[in-house]
Amino acid sequence: MSALPVVVTLLLCGQLLAVEISSEATADSCPKAPEIANSHVEYSVRYQCDKYYKLRAGDGVYTFNNKQWINKDIGQQLPECEDASCPEPPKIENGYVEHSIRFQCKTYYKLRSAGDGVYTFNSKKQWINKNVGQQLPECEAVCGKPKHPVDQVQRIIGGSLDAKGSFPWQAKMVSHHNLISGATLINERWLLTTAKNLYLGHTSDKKAKDIAPTLRLYVGKNQPVEVEKVVLHPDRSKVDIGLIKLRQKVPVNEKVMPICLPSKDYVAVGRVGYVSGWGRNANFNFTEHLKYIMLPVADQDKCVEHYENSTVPENKTDKSPVGVQPILNKNTFCVGLSKYQEDTCYGDAGSAFVVHDQEDDTWYAAGILSFDKSCAVAEYGVYVKVTSILDWVRKTIADN
């Protein structure tokens, strides 16, 4: 007798599970039964469920007859094992029972869809959610919820600040000439940085597709991630911004978490935000540890006047910047020095100016540092306003 493969379908508390069972019955494995007068021999098998399961119907005994396995109760229908730990609920008058499950996301993730994650198994053997129907839920990364917010971190001597995990969205980018700059994680696979950062060590005619392979990128505690592509803003002469797409999603955890993109403007004059980075320190050396600084949003008109005067020799002051000038327009805002006269510096560009919204206890990226040449010499740092590029960011991510 040849081997008979059997497939048993399990119903686990209302959830169908297909389970393959390798069941064999062979004549060689059983000695031939002795013959008696006026009779015939039938071969039979008994299906038994695993521990904590029970047969749904029939006694599990199948007899081989005319090359078919037959059960006296359910015929050729194969048996099903059901979860014995889920007893049938009691019946109620004018009522019925529905089996339901709830999808839940892992720590640091949340449901993306409009539904509540509860699905009911209906008579058509479909899992249905009251809000989204048969559409399965998706889990997306939580953003702007650091485990150790910045206000819980102690300031250290010397004016520099130790982040200690307060800025899990901060990434470090290294060019092919080993020039360090910043980038900001905005979801599991995309980061914002400046167009100037992407062109570090490259000529202005370099194509974006040729820049991507030259970049080294690190998130969390120097965890390397691979760059798939870069996308530059179509008007990068006026909007110093670019997007980086990773080959794989980064797992979100305590050390790696995206910053939230704002739905409103957080750059009113006097508003305080924080900037982190690996830029040069007071000795003009790149720091080995992530530092941060608290800075106030400055008056835009005064900032523009400051930089315009710096190009006129007779108007220059000790605080006038030298060399390249920042991009200043409706897409930017300015930030002043800290109360300790501290500032961002070379290598900090691409980092986010983040603000804490106390209403929803969430951190948002209000700006991306574009002009990091001030280094406490000029009075103002210049940032790309994130609300001004939101449409482009969302479209770029959707199209890629």
UniProtKB/Swiss-Prot annotation:
Predominant cellular place of this UniProt entry's protein: secreted
UniProt-annotated stretches for the region Interaction with CD163: 312-317
UniProt-annotated glycosylation sites, renumbered to this chain: 285, 309, 315
Domain Peptidase S1: 156-398
Cited SMART domains: Tryp_SPc
Subcellular location: Secreted, Extracellular space
Membership in a protein family: Belongs to the peptidase S1 family.
Subunit structure of this chain's protein: Tetramer of two alpha and two beta chains; disulfide-linked. The hemoglobin/haptoglobin complex is composed of a haptoglobin dimer bound to two hemoglobin alpha-beta dimers. Interacts with CD163. Interacts with ERGIC3.
Protein name per its UniProtKB record: Haptoglobin
Organism from which the protein derives: Cervus elaphus
Organism ancestry: Eukaryota, Metazoa, Chordata, Craniata, Vertebrata
Gene designation per UniProt: HP
